[in-house]
Amino acid sequence: YYRDNHKQKEDDNTVVLNVDSTLETLSVDPERIKSAILEHTTRAAENYEYPNSFSLDIPFVSQYPELPTGCEITSLTEVLNYLGYGIDKETLARNYLDMRDTVTQGCFVEYFWGSPWKTTGSGCFAPAIANAANSFLKSQNSSYSAYIMSYSPVEDLFTELSLGHPVIVWTSYNYNDPDVKYNDVTLDDGTVFTWPRNEHCAALSGYDIDRGVVTLADPTYGIVERSMEEFVTYYQKYYYQAVVVR
């Protein structure tokens, strides 16, 4: 699984995250990662208290064998299937996911670098998947829309889920490796982008506060439980990336 090709380094054009810092002290240009806007609006319902446990029956869709590096678009396929759309992962990737072969400005954020059909494909972040989702939903004249939730606290992810809104989250491909490593990728405009190895994506389908677990519809591993502590740690280390469809 080739999620270990790419990262970023510090100079005048660098976009770097200190993964050991808190959200408030992240050393990053947030507009770059958030694609200029944070669209999440759950905080408008401040009086809402999410329950201690909740789950949605989001189906498992395997990314294999067709999309060995297509966990992001496959996670979106799971969510759209849950919402009643019979779209398959390859059609979604082929027609709605913006992909580029070269390292140009916006790499990993606005589009998928490489091809999800190839083991040498790299990946993408929340804006690329939100854009793919909205392109598809618009083509269906759907009342649903996708919203970027990046940098939202985990509690907001649970709030959205408990309101019946499926959430896509970025996490680690390898929960046995707590030390996330990073590679440097120099974009065509000179910006150096930090890419986390083992970057992975899944649909958040449930949580249980009392048991300390979350449930993921994971395109690689199936319907799996992860400890709350591990989930939160990797959510932070993979730049707090998330998308909600509602």
Residue locations for each model-derived region?
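Structural recognition of the beta-strand scaffold that forms the well-ordered cores
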Residues: 70, 146-148, 167-171, 203, ...
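Loop/turn elements at helix/coil->beta-strand transitions in domains of secreted/extracellular proteins
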Residues: 140-144, 163-168, 211-212, 240
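Short, surface-exposed beta-strand/loop "edge" segments at domain boundaries and coil↔beta transitions
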Residues: 155-156, 176-181, 223-225
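Short, solvent-exposed, low-complexity loop/linker segments
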Residues: 158-167, 171-179
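Noncatalytic regulatory segments and standalone regulatory/sensor domains
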Residues: 183-196, 202-246
